[in-house]
Amino acid sequence: MHEGKNAKYVVDTPKKNAKYPSYRVKNDPKVVKPIVQVDADTVPGAEFYAETKWILPGDKKEIKLCESHTHNFGEMLGFFGYNYDDIQDLGAEIEITIDNEKHKVTKSFTAFVPPGVQHGPVIIRNIVRPIFHVSSGPTKVYK
């Protein structure tokens, strides 16, 4: 636990009792590992949410993170490979659908999804190295 008047702004543990909408797929915690989440539940006064997690190689050939859905806010999604020799190498293939258009990506990337635009599913295939995932949007709590 951090001390001081601003310690409440430092988050270093996963969000306890996190609740997610039904379109978020529950994954094996040995493979998809939450790091931290900033939102109005974890940081008083937060005006946005940001969620981070590691996605690790495992037994499954495919991991689905979410089904198709929309938000009333824009969302940034980022996926970054863990290859020191080539930081652009994702170490997997990610299929992300945005507005019914499928994109297959094998490089580290970010995507912005405008408010009201359908996105998902997000499917990760052939993971050979850890992937750092971040998502963020201008909403106090992810819904």
What residue spans do the PLM features occupy?
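A short beta-strand-loop-beta hairpin characteristic of the jelly-roll/cupin
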Residues: 79-106
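Conserved metal-binding segment of the jelly-roll/cupin
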Residues: 102-125
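Short Gly/Pro-enriched loop/turn and capping motifs at secondary-structure junctions
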Residues: 83-85, 118-120, 139-141
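Short, flexible loop/turn elements at secondary-structure junctions
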Residues: 74, 82, 115-117
